[in-house]
Amino acid sequence: MPVKDAPFLEERTAAVMESVFNDPIVKKALDQAVPQEIFTIEEQIEICEVPAPPMKEQTRAAMIAEKINSYGLESSIDPVGNVIACRKGTDPDDPVCVISAHMDNSFREGTDTTVRRQNGRLFAPGISDASRALACMLQVIRMVVNNDIKTKGTLLFIATVGQEAEGDLRGVKRIFYSSGIHVDGVLVLDGADPGRLLYGSVGSKRYKVEYSGPGGHSYLNFGQYPSATQALCRAGALLANLQVPAEPRTTFTLATLNGGSSVNAIAEHAECEIDLRSEDAQMLDGLVQEVLPLFAFGAQLENQRWNVTDPALQVRCKVTPIGHRPAAVSKPDSPVLQAARAAQMALGIKLTDFTSASTDQNVPMSLGIPSTTLGGGGREGFNHSLSEWFEPVRSYEGPQLCLLTALALVGLESGSEPLLPIYTAAPREQWQDRL
């Protein structure tokens, strides 16, 4: 969605933001963020250099928990590894707003994440994604605690596990599918640019496809037995020619390919992983229904090519779901979008992008819980690569934006009412993680 289509601020939102922004204690906290950014950057570097490969975030989780405790909140680690800390509001009947950042990076275990400084930039795998978001969240905690900012609603800080790749959002799924924690709104910290706002969640469904057959000698058994790799190639060719809509943006990727055991053997095994995405949940489901039969058809074509009718000698296809990130779209009057946009305007932050992406917001947004994603501040480049960099240009705007947005959502003790409504949970069956 173009930036020009960003939501128009409602009068109530503007009034609440004006009240929060002009509160003397809040102004003091916002001003302090500028000189304190030096400490935040050093903490970002420290976080980056603590390993957190996919599915192995324990060391970093222990570090984040210890830091939160030292900053004046009591943290705990839940059964899947999320670090959770609560800053209770003065009114237990007022809303609960989550501020979250994921702990895992996208690099395999053993990757050197030592940070290098050069020409005003910081270089290291993971220095921006997600070290910046974690440092931003910790700075928001310090701003709230050190200035004793009292809110009507509750702020719940969560450092999540499993956001990247095979993690499949397992941390945030735990929070919203099975923890029993009540949440009314969500601010996810991810990326750097504080000018970007997310109105939508790009959904994805991922599958592992396996072919198995009898195998055989490439010369002696030629024409007698089907090939698992050739069945996969036939299916891949069908997928490559598939037509998908440009709007809502919908994509497919044959991501990985493996198969065969020797150059002189008919392959008895082949496998691949496919990634299907769309901004629209119904479009994503339709894409799944269109794509998965292609792989079964690939096996059928290979068996037909060699006229193999004996089931024991045919290539067989097996499809296994390996990931699901639900799709969702927010309405323009979503309180988190309203509050975030108002906070940007109050801070003089230009709206640079109003778009959809895949972040921890996917799960709560798909349940109807008001959610968006905010940048942690600064500039970034080459994320998910060994050349990843972060530039701390006005990076203090990230913590400022997050704090101001959150305070408008939960309300100040002595100020206006919270912008967040109390969320009424969907029927239990709608909360289940169905692939």
What kind of feature is each model-predicted range?
Residues 80-81, 91-97, 111-112, 118-119, ...:
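Short coil/turn connectors at secondary-structure junctions
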